[in-house]
Amino acid sequence: MKRVMLYFGSFNPVHKGHIALAEYVVEQGLCDEAVLIVSPQSPYKRAAELAPEMDRFEMAERACAASRLPERIKPSVVEFLLPKPSYTIDTLRYLTENHGAEMEFSILMGADQLERLDGWKEYEKILEYPIYVYPRHGEQVGRFAGRITVLEDAPLQDFSSTEVRGRIERGEDVSQMLDAGVAEYIRRKGLWSPAARKAALTAQIAAEPENTELYTERGKLHYRLNEWGAALNDFNRVLQLDDSHAEARQYAQMVQEKLEFRYKDIYNP
């Protein structure tokens, strides 16, 4: 029977740390194949944070193909085909019912996911599967002792997908974090560029016109791009909705100072 380890995640984007973990579990003989289950939309994440699902899958496909074990590390679209929202137990149940005769499934997850596991749908059923957990640097994993296996010597990277997205948005180098094919795909598609991020936030604001955090995030993006007028408009909108919003007030004051300095008439102080 083939042993298949399922690595669930949004992979937004997939980075070298994800692939290093997949290579590790295969090379350590913990499974015959590692499969990256690309989530269409996490029940615990805002939809606006995610790149389109097929973009995330294609990046995962490129990263897996460039791994040391391309025949044994693969991505899957199975959760794209199941009813939404996507929950881990539903995917496990579907795979077991349809492939359990020839495959034995286990799960790979991070210690941060394990900490939240008891909030997941039917988490006790999930614990019936073998679970392998990779801790963060220097972290002790104490939850569900005896029901999980901690991978103490798993390879860990000092960055996350969140950091990768932030660096892309700021135009910083990500070559040490991403496979070259993934980086090229992101550049070609314009994923997580400032323009793409602004468009996503604007669409989300249209759907949630009183969400102060969305205006704040877009305002900070305008601020980083030196778009002072647009930034001030967003921060003022936040203060209209919530006069006690300290972060928006601080940013609005900083923008006002920049505008006053820029347009001050030095001949008529």
Task: Name each model feature, range by range.
Residues 1-197:
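Nucleotidyltransferase catalytic core that binds NTPs
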